Amino acid sequence: MNITFIGSGYVGLVSGVMMSYLGHNVTCLDNDEAKISKLNKRILPIYETKLDKYFTQALEHERLKFTSFYNEELKNTEAVFITVGTPSKASGEADLSYVYEAIDKISLHINKDCLIVIKSTVPPNSCNNIINYLKEKGFSFNVASNPEFLREGNAVEDFLYPDRIVIGVNNKESEDILRKIYMPLTDNGAELVITDLVTAELIKYGSNSFLATKIAFINEMANLCEKIGADIKNLSKGIGLDKRIGTAFLNAGPGFGGSCFPKDILALNSIIKNNYIDSKILEAVIRSNKERPSLMVDKIATLLDEDLKGKNIAVLGLTYKAGTDDVRASPAIEIIKNLLDKGTYVKAFDPMGLENSQKTFQNENLLYLDSAIKVCDSSDAIIITTEWSEFQALDWQKIYSLVKTPIIIDLRNILKADEVESIGFRYYTVGSKI
């Protein structure tokens, strides 16, 4: 089928590349001409595990094109996916201005049988509102909801082997088109959840907010473990092996970040409030996660004898999680800001997130370096803020010989305590008694 993606950010680009792998002819359209220029030069503007392989393959098979022009090509598309951003307003509500901008532009070019698919995360009833908006302008396109559930760092596998594919439709024609698009995956065993438009939209918000709640819960359990001497790793395992709960998202750490969880839980909380419902759970999760970076810095201060002023801190990890170059709402960046506010000097490294971090945040007392070894040299403490496997494989014996004070504060609990302690490091984790 001929498919177009409007918006070539993380979701649009990954989905476009992988749709072409399924055999569809895909055009990715974006207003950012510099990004499109890069893509046409076969340069991926994001890092995502394994994506480069499928990107190259799609281009070689001539099933993937990039453009910044809304033109005649859209007349041949059978489905156009809206994958633009829906950032948070100050109120927490989702800003749909980019969605409506895309709708306005494509409605002038697509044919009457083309299906508009909203893949951007939008509040419940957005698709119905878009249908009414188009009718007011004299258009009668079918509109469907198809939320994405790709995890950054694991997006390729998530696309190929999804837990479920959710589609929200209000007629058989829309359902048939989406069934045809996803047939290569459903024939391979992927479960298709077909529902109405509003429910499909709400599934995405509910899923992300529930996962965020699991993270906030285990972080609060880690706080308790530190007070009473319990072991957070075994606690997480003992809870998570209950099949009703599951082990995913039960790793204690510095909090959740990224482009989805913080934004989506704020939006869902706003939706609930706007419907005159008291949202105690979500508000508690939002507050707990917002406070998490400062709690981590308080922990660091306690371990470094309270006064952080003038300390040289090495920070390993800038992205909000491993496997991506995304630093949006990253706990690591917030921790660095808190450390700088307390008068520290920070050197930071990340295997994939350096460039985005440098664009996002600069400070005269913050130095970004291109290796973990350089960052750790002469440090008063090493803070691990992202769970990159590269940090587990570092030459800790060599690092021990370079540091000023042999202290590791592992906010991701990824190192083996006996190994680094046998070298001579004082090693502290999240969820261990201070």
Curated annotation (Swiss-Prot):
Its EC number is 1.1.1.22. It is an enzyme of class 1 (oxidoreductase). Pathway: Nucleotide-sugar biosynthesis; UDP-alpha-D-glucuronate biosynthesis; UDP-alpha-D-glucuronate from UDP-alpha-D-glucose: step 1/1. NAD(+) binds at residues 2-19, 30, 35, 121, 152, 263, 328. It catalyses: UDP-alpha-D-glucose + 2 NAD(+) + H2O = UDP-alpha-D-glucuronate + 2 NADH + 3 H(+). The keyword Transcription does not apply. Gene3D superfamilies: Cytochrome c1, transmembrane anchor, C-terminal, NAD(P)-binding Rossmann-like Domain. InterPro entries: 6-PGluconate_DH-like_C_sf, NAD(P)-bd_dom_sf, UDP-Glc/GDP-Man, UDP-Glc/GDP-Man_DH_C, UDP-Glc/GDP-Man_DH_C_sf, UDP-Glc/GDP-Man_DH_dimer, UDP-Glc/GDP-Man_DH_N, UDPglc_DH_bac. This is UDP-glucose 6-dehydrogenase. One of its GO terms (biological process) is polysaccharide biosynthetic process. GO terms for molecular function: NAD binding; UDP-glucose 6-dehydrogenase activity. It comes from the Bacteria. Keywords: NAD, Oxidoreductase. SUPFAM superfamilies: 6-phosphogluconate dehydrogenase C-terminal domain-like, NAD(P)-binding Rossmann-fold domains, UDP-glucose/GDP-mannose dehydrogenase C-terminal domain. The active site is at residue 260.
